[in-house]
Amino acid sequence: MLKEYRTITEVAGPLMLVQKVEGVKYGELGEIELANGEIRRCKVLEVDGQNALVQLFESSTGINVATSKVRFLGRSIELPVSMDMLGRVFSGMGKPLDGGPNIIPDKRLDINGLPMNPAARNYPSEFIQTGISAIDGLNTLVRGQKLPIFSGSGLPHAQLAAQIARQAKVLGTDSKFAVVFAAVGITFEEADYFISDFKRTGAIDRTVLFINLANDPAIERISTPRMALTAAEYLAFDKGMHVLVIITDITNYAEALREVSAARKEVPGRRGYPGYLYTDLATIYERAGRRIDSEGSITLIPILTMPEDDKTHPIPDLTGYITEGQIILSRELHRKGVTPPIDVLPSLSRLKDKGIGKGKTREDHADTMNQLFAAYARGKEAKELAVILGDAALSDTDKLYAKFADAFEKEYVSQGFNEDRSIEKTLEIGWKLLSILPRSELKRIRDEYLDKYLPKAAEN
């Protein structure tokens, strides 16, 4: 029998103080029963002696401190999990949104999970094909990696996220592949886009969707990424699946964290975010990876919008410390009509060399990647010089590099949001572009690969 308390003494915004409590724990769920019988949910944020500070999941409107009562449920937030989750759409708290029945669970898991023992981690080493040349060819995603996408307000990161979720696959393996997609603090229009896109393309069948709308409570926004990762851990480590987790938008998550922190009157850190923002983000990002004792894996792509396109803002800054690289979207490329507008030069995948080469992608991948980076960087320099001094100031070689840079953006980076390129197609396009330059300029590629692949590219 659950004990009921009629000792609510204060309600301030989303917070409520309950006195004279016994045996209540941090993170415990509770229910508030109003005088009219309505039930609202809450969660314990802090326990000080016999006082418990709880956060409401819903509005505090209508709560009367004299007539309302609280009971604590003795458990934290849990997610019921089973294979039936695939193909379903849930709220940020794990409730079905698609009109289907509740999940009959194999088990119930605490959404906070457990940290993965560093000694039990397996090193990421298998290539994941996203079908996007700028990622597969130059900033390769590896199974078990944490690779964020840094975007800006108004850039098409939603379309890119949907494209990756549709197209991602692990090559050369019989293991099943699943996608867990968590949308945090998005508008109804964006939610409708994601759900419709996954259903239209059939990707919904291998996907678990968690949708948290902008008008949902902040506490739900904080729970949504953890719901997604809990589902991913079940699919990966209990069922042996390769799971790709995409979370958009981490900025909305951090804003919710700041809102809760301000309500608790905590001492703010940089830009008003709580001082524990780094630690809190790490509890999300570090749940990705591979385990020695499991065939499954969790690969994480968190997407965040940089306020004012500022890479030094606390959210992208701290995310960069925890994760293994970043994919950066460019407003300049977006204005040029390049889709997806991935700026390959400042982008980085720190584990890309572990997932490419003979037996994984192709033997010439590393050499062509390095040469494409170098040629594009020099081509951009040549174009900047031409703006200042005019085309006449460029040498014939510089003009070829400028031509290469334009062709690279148009043919390699830009592919639209519906084209799914194989890694062979991506490498073929790379060689075709490199054939614009004289062979003497291709100093980063071994002669054996030049002899083997360059003549074919020149013919195309």
UniProtKB/Swiss-Prot annotation:
One of its GO terms (biological process) is proton motive force-driven plasma membrane ATP synthesis. PROSITE patterns: ATPASE_ALPHA_BETA (PS00152). Pfam families: ATP-synt_ab, ATP-synt_ab_N, ATP-synt_VA_C. Gene3D superfamilies: 3.40.50.12240. The keyword Magnesium does not apply. One of its GO terms (molecular function) is proton-transporting ATP synthase activity, rotational mechanism. Keywords: ATP synthesis, Hydrogen ion transport, Ion transport, Transport. NCBIfam families: PRK04196.1. PANTHER family: V-TYPE PROTON ATPASE SUBUNIT B. Produces ATP from ADP in the presence of a proton gradient across the membrane. The V-type beta chain is a regulatory subunit. Belongs to the ATPase alpha/beta chains family. This is V-type ATP synthase beta chain. It comes from Acetivibrio thermocellus (strain ATCC 27405 / DSM 1237 / JCM 9322 / NBRC 103400 / NCIMB 10682 / NRRL B-4536 / VPI 7372).
